[in-house]
Each structure stands twice: as C-alpha cells, then as structure tokens.
UniProtKB/Swiss-Prot annotation:
Disulfide bonds: none annotated. It catalyses: RNA(n) + a ribonucleoside 5'-triphosphate = RNA(n+1) + diphosphate. One of its GO terms (molecular function) is DNA-directed RNA polymerase activity. Belongs to the RNA polymerase beta chain family. CDD domains: RNA_pol_B_RPB2. The keyword Cell membrane does not apply. GO terms for biological process: DNA-templated transcription. This is DNA-directed RNA polymerase subunit beta. It is an enzyme of class 2 (transferase).
Length: 1184
C-alpha cells in the first residue's frame, strides 16, 4: 500500500485534495439551507392562501353582510437588503389583499384592494432583516397531532393503558384504565367519565348497542357498571356538567357544546398531518397483521369469499385482501339515535380471536378511510380509537413511543408564520364582525371594515419577541449555517427545560440520518436543541426524511434509485450500512451484511436487505462532518469539537486545513457568506468591492453573450457578534465561471473553502509545567506574523432627544472639557473617521439641558441687568467604554431633516464604528477540531521554543496528558497526516467514517520521507540540548475562539452602587465590583485578618459616609478614618421592623442608639462624590 493510497478530488476552482474515501458518493448533498427557503416559499405560495380560505367568508351576526378574501399579492420591498440594514428597517414587502363585500339584502357587490401591512421577506440566505438586524427563525420539533397509545404501570405494579387524541388546536380526548379495570375518558383535561358515557352521547344509548358495537368483554362490563347514565340524553347532560360546571344543563346546549368542541372545523383542527396520522394508526391493515380471523370475509359486491374463519393474516394474505378492505369489506353503517350527530356513521369492523385468549372474539373497528380534507375529528374516529384501546387490553395493537421521530414533526418558518398570522386574522375577524353590525350597510366598504392592526402586531410580535426568532449567530459562516439548520424542542407549544426529562433528550434510533446524535449544546439545553443531519429533508407533513438506495427485490442488487423515508416508513425495512462491500453490478459481496432494523443492529443474509445508506456522513450534521477522524474520537469530545468550530473568530489571514473532510467547500458555498455566481459567464472586471460577470448562454449550440451581472462585495462590515465580515474576490479577469461557483470568499474562507483557523506546527510535550491543565504554550512568531490576528468592529450610538426641559444638542461646546479632548471632533462635535481613540475618549459631544434651579439674589440682579442667565447644561456625551479603544472606521448620521425614520422624540442619531485589531494574547482560548480546548498560558520568544533537527522552532506546545483520558485520538492522527501533507505540499480529505485508516496515514508518512514512528528529536531552545525522548510533532489545525481575554478583563476602583443596599453592582456590563462572598470571608477569618475584613465589608462596600471620607483621605494623603455602619445593616433593621418586630440597637453601655445618630451630620453632598444608580437603572442590580 505504500505511496499511492487516495485519489485526487477537485473542490471548486482553486483546490484539489487527495481523498481517502473508499465509498463513492451516489447522491450530492442537498442545498443546506433548503429547510428555511423551501418552507418560506411554501408559505408565500400556499400557506397564506390557505389562511385566507379558512377565514373567508366573514359574515355578520344577522347574516346580511359577507366579506370574502379573493386574492392577495406581495409588492416590491421598500428597501433593498443592504439599505434595510443601514436604516434599521425591516426588509419587507407590502401585502395587498383583494376583498369582496356582498350585501345579501340588496345583492350589491363591492370589490376593493386593501393594504394589510408590510410582510417581512426572507433573504436568499434564509434570514430575515428585522430592525436592521439579521434574524433566523429556528424550526421547532413538536409532538405530531394524532392518536397515541401508551402503556403505564400503576402503584401496585398493575399494567394499564392510556391514550390521547392530540389535535393541532382544540380539545384533547384522553382514555385511561384504572385499578378496577374501568375505562375512563377525559374531555379537555376535565374530570374523568366512564368511556361509555361518551359513546352514549354519540347516539349509542343502550348498553346493548354499546356491547354490539365494541364487542362483549370484562372491561366494557365493568365500565357499564360504573356508568350511571342509561341513554343518550342523560349522557349529554353528564358531559355538559363536567365541561361547564355550575351552569344549568340542557340537552340542546350539551349537544351544541360537543359539536363545537369536536366537530367544528374552526374550533378543532387536526391539520393534514393529524388526519394522515389518525388514518394510518386506525387503519385495519396494520391492526390485522398476524391475527386470526373469527369470521369469514365476503366481498359485498361479488359475494366471493376473500378469507375464511380461522385464517392467520400474515404479510402475504394481508397484502392480498388490502384492496378488498379498501373497497368496503366489513363496512357497517351505524345509525345513532338522539346523539350529537344526526347523520349515520360509517365504520369498518372485523372480528378476530384475541391473541391472549383463543376462545374470545374481539371486534376491530377502523374509521373507514376518512377523506384527507376532513380536518376535524369524526364520530367514526372516536369509535375506532375507543375500539383500538379495548383491543390493546386484549393484546392487539402497539403502543407508541413518543420520542420516535415518526411521532415528532418539524414546524418550520412557513408554518410558524402561518400560525402567527392566523392569530392576527382571527383577532381581525372579531373586529370586522363588530364593525359590520355598527356601520351603515349602504355606504360601507371593505376598507372601513378591515382593521389591520392586530395582523401587523402579531407578525411584529413573532419576529421581535418569539423564542424561535433568534438573533443570527454570525461569528463565522459555519455558525450561520448551523443556526439555520437548528431544530429546537423549546418554544411556544413545545417543551420547557425544567419539564423535559431524560428520555426526550436522549439519542433515539430513529434519529439516524435525520438528526445529528453529536451536535447539541452542553448545559441545560442538551438534547433539546439539535441539528439536522447533512442529507435530511423535510416532507410536506413536517416529518424528517433521510435518503436510502433501493435494493431491487428480484435481483438483490443495490440500484441508484434513491428513496426518501420517514422514520415511520423506515421501521418496516432492513437497511444496510453505507460501507457494505458491493461488486460492480451492485450485489453484496458478503453473505452476511451488517444492517439495522428498528433499534437492532444485526448481521443479516443479503437477500433480506431492502435498502442501503447513501453515505457514511448521512448520520451527522454539517459541523460534525467537518471533523476529520471523527471515528477515532470519543463522542463527548466530538460534541465539543462541533460546537467550538462555530465559535471560531474569522482571522485576518485564514488558511484552509491541510487535513480536511471535503465538507469545507459545500458548507462555505451554502452558508450564504460567500459571493456565488447567479449565471454562467466570463469575469470581465474584478476589484475589491465589485465583480462584473458577462453572462454567457448556449443557444442552438452557439455561445451567446448577454448582459452584465454586477456583484457587490461587503467590506469590513460588523457582524451580529462584532466580528469583521469581509469578502474578497476569488476569481481573476477572464475566468469562465459556472452558476453557483464561488466568486468571492467571505469571512473565514480560503479559496472557496471554510477556513476557521490556521495550520500550525504542534509538539505534544510539557515545558516547565506551563501547559498544566490543558494550557497552551505558544511561540511569539504567531503574534509577530499576525497568524492569529482578528479584526473586531464595535458599534456605539448616541441619540439627541427632546426632553421636558428642551432638546438635547450635539455640539463641540461641552462644559468643563479641555481643547485637548476635543481635538478629533469636527464642528458638529462628532469624531472624525480614522481617529485613534482610547478608553473614555469623546466620540460624540452632546449636552442636555439641566433643571432650572432657584436663582440667588445676585443672579437675579445680574439677570435683570443683562437679561441672560448662564446656560444650564450637563455633559451627556458618548465616550469610549473600558476596553473599547481602537480606530474609528465609520460614522453614520441620521437626522429628522434628512428624512430618516427615527423613533419618536429622537432628533438626531449618530452611530460610530470602532475597529480593533486583536493579536493573540495570553488568556485567549484556542481549540482544535476534536474538542481539545485550552487557554494560552505563555507566549515564548521564538528562540526559547524547542526546535527540530533542521532548526525549525515549533509553534505550539500541547500537554500530552490531554489525550489519553479524553480519548480523542483523532487529533494525533491529524497531527501525523498533517505533517505528511505539508511535506508533500498537498491537501487531503478524510471524510467522516470513511476516511484515512491507520495504514493510509503511515503510508502517507512514509511517502513524505518522515521517520517510521512519525516522531522527531527536539532540541531545547534555551540550552540547545536534545530532549530525552522522541516527541510527536506535526501540523494541527488550531482555531482561535470568540472567548477573548480583552472582552473579559475588568477592573474597578469606584463606580455605580445599588440604590437600596448601596453595595457596588456586579458584572463587567455594569462596571461592577468583585463579590467578596461568604467563603472568602471565612478565609480571612481563618487568618484572623480583622482589619482587612472590616475594610472590605464597610468602606470598600456599603458604608456610605466612610467610603467618601476614605476617598477624601487618600486624595489628601491623610490616614484612613474609622469605618462606620454598613448601609445593608440599616436595611436589615428596617426589614425586621417592617415585619412588626421591635428591633433596637444598643451600644456597649447598653444605651439605645438612634438610627439617625448613625449618620454623620457633616456628610451631605455624597451624590456628587459618587454616581449612585437612580431607580431607572435599578434593573442593573443583580441579586446574587
């Protein structure tokens, strides 16, 4: 195998990698943000129309007026995407709806087009722009509507069952057994009733009718005994009393209540998915499987016998009678009397012998194939679900696993928007009805009826404050892509963190190929937030499907026909793994093949295989698929690796990894961070900000040139996370490009591939203990050569408002500020672009009028003579906060006069962008792709770093002890392969679960002329002596993470204090102090450091008088005074007194001290000495 393992694969225009993949890719990866774009497109095409259809027509209470929705269209957006961002606006288009108002008395018809608010549009990248910020709507995983059965044990260990019919919206119906074998029903979470009461209410009034319907059995007899009603009317009254306790029940009220609760499409909605699930569950086909018939089945039309009494219905027999089942075998038309529904009920019922009692006949009742468009529940559904429940008690039927992905579905953007829009429309409907009855019928127009406020408000609320509408994670392109593919079980109608148990969070076998088992956050959300697997798609019902290659049942060959299966469908098939060996014709070469069936992994004869995986990476998500040698890492560490890649800061000079997985190109292309070609063509002109492409198309075999596409590149824009979003051209003039090709690299990209970090020379060795506990030692070369330098852009804004005392003003003329501080401000008081600023420098000069104080006699005299009072203003300028210094990149000014839309009361708004270039630094966090993270503890001069025999110093030293216990061996393989790749001048691709194996790595190492063990002798840079043992040195891909020490460093001498306790606030954001907590106090007590302790608890914290005096003493150079009484002690006393306790303070001589005596008289002007937080900022108080 020496030398030539692997083959070359091209990724985009500029990169070729040697790939070690053995399995050929049958299927291209789908477009990775399709889950967002396709769902929104559905909403625009179908979802909106469905909504208007549901609500139309709106009729008034008398039925004279009727308002219909005929059509709608979306206009052109007011601003482009870029403009919306700059102006803090929404990227939205006006929604216009065509309405028709019909006056039924006069037959008059009025048509009118009505504006219904601006509707947010999705950008091509799958994001929304709301108030100028990019947001993502995360898809939600919820329980699918349908009917579920589950087994449960009561406290005596007796097995019982429970069942629930869950609608999309409407009342729940729950069945359960109790200890006495009585079957109960609960309607909409009320008290339970015997289930026979519900059957009687449906019109099966007598005991005999119920027994004929369900079939005679002990459970039913027990339930009938418990049931104290004996006809339909009594049953209706009984149900009414449960649902509306305290109201006088009448039969008519009860009837209409039940009808509106369950059979009214406006109040009860299963959605198409619920109808599909219910029909599937209650269908006789699945319920008769492997059962023994207790009656002979006869075709109702021809009279021929289809199956005889005593036949066992195995898969073959069942498949034969399915067409007959669908044509009406066993159909019974029931005619209920006095019940809720007047119409007859059609059910399908077949008798079989109970599996747990051969003598006993039981009825299996199905709902007789209700049409897909019936969105509410029907009496036959209720009867069939009750029948299923009784069948379960006799061992027929299956219970459902709620965590199975066949029972959980996705609500993507389109559906979430539709639900929100529906809320708005139904609120509007109420208003329309009221207006219809109030206004004059002759002159009324649709425009006067419609109030669009509720609709606009509900959409705004959804995008602005829903839990699923999130500020996009834009740290780097991978973070962006993952955020759009995220699946959350939280949010409205979903789970809550506290309630979610272990089962919901756990990995389930049905996740295979649908949800990534690895990528999920660590912490309270683990398992509740997941990521879509790389090949997964979402079907029209919202179930996740994964692709498989079909195996031809005749020839047993694997074909290239791809089927997308939901978790439910997959349960019926045996699926072989992607790495099963095939010959050229696609036949399995081995007799026994490793395969999956439901939750089992089995070795199966090759004839039993139905499907085969398309690719080894179909199990994992995009971020996980970017980890090379994933198969050699422990899953916990892989999880950290996948999550940390999303936190990589875009570097100034990014570099694609030597050891990649081949996913780098696809993920960069689909993330939306790159500039991609919209059409084929030839590049005519390239500059930093623009690329022009002349379109070229083939017409009748001839090339025809068309118009020019101009692509604008974004330069040095601030991303949502404050990293620098910068695009660079990736093509040259004269290049031919094809549609979808990358024209410009975005942030963290190199030659059209994702490039989150840099390839650096790493040695696994300790060095004077500086890499204890995962710390990292780094060479100064990485600082000097800007290897890990990143650019950060921060935004600060200042607004001039109207106040009660007059307008604020932006000006250069600021009280008590020297000319030196104003040197970089222009005549308007705004900083110039390019100025270098440090902490506390002025950015925008602004003054606010002060309250007018009582004038003294002298001032009044002066005022009388000169008529001019000294201008009373205070300085409220915008200054650079701590740690925010840098260079002013850009200044944006918005004013009312220039026609910019500003919030009410704001006259002028100034935004200042400050850019920082951050070199790597001690205390910064770095990581590899295998969950191997650490903090830089020391940056050594190049000459002190250990060097290789050829004199090359290493770049980074990692602790070898970080590897064995964490079991992420992938990093060691990456190290050796990376070294070989660098020596050979190649890039390699080692896809997950199908990458380079050990032999490949060693043969590449040998090809590169490295030592057999891939280790090196290293020499100490300080003494020049060789280290005792050979050391693993190689090239590893290391990334710098967003947790940088500059953002965390914080110090305070004096600052804001909390209003009530007078203690310093906490946290960097509030410029707070460090909490000296209970345990720290114990430490000082243990040392007997009484004075230090007293000082910390009083003058450094909340002894208001003492801290001012101490400050004064320090300034004047005097000795520090005695500490006084802490403010929190006074608060404690007041709290005790407010509880009605008489608390007195006594001095040493047991004399009472008044609270007032504790304050010093000469202490008056404390508010000027210290900035005490006033109540409006009291929100900043963080209670520990």
């Amino acid at each position: 195998m020496s030398g030539h393992s692997g083959h070359d694969v091209k990724y985009g225009r500029h990169r070729t990698r040697r790939s070690f993949a053995r399995i050929s890719e049958v299927l291209e990866l789908p477009n990775l943000i399709e889950i967002q774009t396709a769902s929104y497109q559905w909403f625009l095409d179908e979802g909106l129309r469905e909504m208007f259809r549901d609500i139309s027509p709106i009729e008034d209470f008398a039925g004279n007026l009727s308002l219909e929705f005929i059509d709608y269209d979306l206009g052109e957006p007011k601003y482009s995407v870029e403009e919306s961002k700059n102006r803090d606006a929404n990227y939205a288009a006006p929604l216009r709806v065509k309405l028709r108002l019909i006056n039924k008395e006069t037959g008059e018809v009025k048509d009118q087009e009505v504006f219904m608010g601006d509707f947010p549009l999705m950008t091509e990248m799958g994001t929304f722009i709301i108030n100028g910020a990019e947001r993502v709507i995360v898809s939600q995983l919820v329980r699918s509507p349908g009917v579920y059965f589950n087994g449960k044990l009561d406290k005596n260990g007796k097995k019982g069952f429970g069942s629930t019919v869950i609608p999309n919206r409407g009342a729940w119906l729950e069945y359960e057994t109790d200890a006495k074998d009585v079957v109960h029903v609960r309607i909409d979470r009320t008290r339970k009733l015997p289930v026979t009461v519900l059957l009687r209410a449906l019109g099966f009034g007598s005991d005999q009718e119920i027994i004929d319907l369900i079939g005679d059995n002990d459970y039913l007899r027990n339930t009938l005994e418990k049931d104290n009603t004996d006809n339909a009317e009594k049953a209706l009254l009984e149900i009414y009393e449960r649902l509306r306790p305290g109201e006088p029940p009448t039969v008519d009220n009860a009837r209409s209540l039940l009808v509106s609760r369950f059979f009214d499409p406006k109040r009860y909605d299963l959605a198409s998915v619920g109808r599909y699930k219910i029909n599937k569950k209650l269908h006789l086909k699945n319920r008769l499987f492997n059962q023994t018939l207790a009656e002979t089945l006869v075709d109702p039309e021809t009279g021929e016998i289809i199956a005889s009494k005593g036949d066992i219905l195995d898969r073959r027999n069942l498949d034969q009678i399915i067409p007959n089942l669908e044509n009406g075998v066993g159909f019974r038309t029931l005619r209920p009397t006095d019940g809720v529904m007047e119409d007859s009920v059609l059910v399908q019922s077949i008798k079989i012998y109970a599996p747990n009692d051969e003598e006993k006949e039981i009825n299996i009742i199905g709902n007789a194939y209700i049409e897909e468009n019936v969105k509410h529940i029907t009496p036959s559904d209720i009867i069939s679900s009750i029948s299923y429940f009784f069948n379960l008690l006799h061992g027929v039927g299956d219970t459902d696993d709620i965590d199975h992905l066949g029972n959980r579905r996705l609500r993507s953007v389109g559906e979430l928007l539709q639900n929100q829009f529906r809320i708005g429309l139904s609120r509007m409907e109420r208003v329309v009805r009221e207006r219809m009855s109030i206004q004059d019928m002759t002159t009324i127009t649709p425009q006067q009826l419609i109030n669009i406020r509720p609709v606009v408000a509900s959409i705004k609320e959804f995008f602005g404050s829903s839990q699923l509408s999130q500020f996009m994670d834009q740290t780097n392109p991978l973070g962006e892509l993952t955020h759009k593919r995220r699946l959350s079980a939280l949010g409205p109608g979903g789970l809550t963190r506290e309630r979610a148990g272990y089962e919901v969070r756990d990995v389930h076998y049905s996740h295979y190929g649908r949800m990534c088992p690895i990528e999920t956050p660590e912490g309270p959300n683990i398992g509740l937030i997941n990521s879509l697997s790389s090949f997964a798609k979402v079907n029209k019902f919202g179930f996740i499907e994964t692709p498989y290659r079909r195996v031809d049942p005749e020839t047993n060959r694997v074909t290239d026909k791809i089927d997308y299966l939901t978790a439910d469908e997959e349960d019926n098939y045996v699926v072989a793994q992607a790495n099963s060996k095939l010959d050229e014709q696609g036949t399995f070469t081995e007799e026994e093949v490793m395969a999956r069936f439901r939750s089992e992994n089995l070795a199966v004869e090759k004839e039993r295989i139905d499907y085969m995986d398309v690719s080894p990476k179909q199990v994992v998500s995009v971020a996980t698929a970017c980890i090379p040698f994933l198969e050699n890492d422990d899953s916990n560490r892989a999880l950290m690796g996948a999550n940390m890649q999303r936190q990589a800061v875009p570097l100034m000079h990014p570099e694609a990894p030597f050891v990649g997985t081949g996913m780098e190109h696809v993920s960069a292309k689909d993330s939306g961070a790159a500039v991609t070609a919209k059409h084929d063509g030839i590049v005519e002109h390239v500059e930093a900000r623009e690329i022009w492409v002349r379109r070229v198309s083939l017409v009748d075999g001839k090339e025809v040139t068309g118009g020019i596409d101009k692509y604008t590149l974004r330069k040095f824009v601030r991303s949502n996370q404050g990293t620098c979003y910068n695009q660079r051209p990736n093509v040259a003039e004269g290049d031919r490009v094809v549609k979808g090709e990358i024209l410009g690299n975005g942030p963290s990209m190199d030659s059209g591939e994702l490039a989150l970090g840099r390839n650096v020379l790493v040695a696994f060795m300790t060095w004077d203990g500086y890499n204890y506990e995962d710390a990292i030692i780094m060479s100064e070369r990485l600082v000097k050569d800007d290897v890990y330098t990143s650019i950060h852009i921060e935004e600060f804004e200042s607004e001039a408002r109207d106040t009660k005392l007059g307008p604020e003003e932006m000006t250069r003329d600021i009280p008590n500020v020297g000319e030196d501080a104003l040197r970089d401000l222009d005549e308007r008081g705004i900083i110039r672009v390019g100025a270098e600023v440090k902490d506390n420098d002025l950015l925008v000069g602004k003054v606010t009028p002060k309250g007018v104080t009582e004038l003294t006699a002298e001032e009044r005299l002066l005022h009388a003579i000169f008529g001019e009072k000294a201008r009373e203003v205070r300085d409220t300028s915008l200054r650079v906060p701590h740690g925010g210094g840098g260079i002013v990149l850009d200044v944006k000014i918005f004013t009312r006069e220039a026609g910019d839309e500003l919030p009410p009361g704001v006259n002028q708004l100034v935004r200042v962008y400050i850019v920082q270039k951050r070199k790597i630094h001690e205390g910064d966090k770095m990581a590899g792709r295998h969950g191997n993270k650490g903090v830089i503890s020391r940056i050594l001069p190049e000459e002190d770093m250990p060097f290789m025999p050829d004199g090359t110093p290493v770049d980074i030293m990692l602790n070898p002890l970080g590897v064995p216990s964490r079991m992420n061996i992938g990093q060691v393989l990456e190290l050796h392969l990376g070294m070989a790749a660098r020596a050979l001048g190649i890039h390699v691709a080692t896809p997950v679960f199908d990458g380079a194996n050990e032999e490949d790595v060693w043969s590449t190492v040998e090809e590169a002329g490295m030592a057999r063990d891939a280790k090196t002798v290293l020499y100490d840079g300080r003494s020049g002596e060789a280290f005792d043992n050979r050391i693993s040195v190689g090239v590893m891909y290391m990334i710098k993470l967003a947790h940088m020490v500059d953002d965390k460093l914080h110090a305070r001498s004096t600052g804001p204090y909390s209003l009530v306790t007078q203690q310093p606030l906490g946290g960097k954001a509030q410029f707070g102090g460090q909490r000296f907590g209970e345990m720290e106090v114990w430490a000082l007590e243990a040392y007997g450091a009484a004075y230090t302790l007293q000082e910390i608890l009083t003058i450094k914290s909340d002894d208001v008088v003492g801290r001012v005096k101490t400050y004064e003493a320090i300034v004047k150079g005097e000795s520090v005074p005695e500490p006084g009484v802490p403010e929190s002690f006074k608060v404690l006393i007041k709290e005790l007194q407010s509880l009605g306790m008489d608390v007195k303070m006594l001095s040493a001589d047991e004399e009472e001290i008044e609270m007032r005596d504790m304050d010093d008289d000469d202490f008056t002007n404390q508010n000027d000495a210290f900035n005490i937080v006033q109540p409006e900022n009291a929100a900043a108080e963080k209670t520990e």
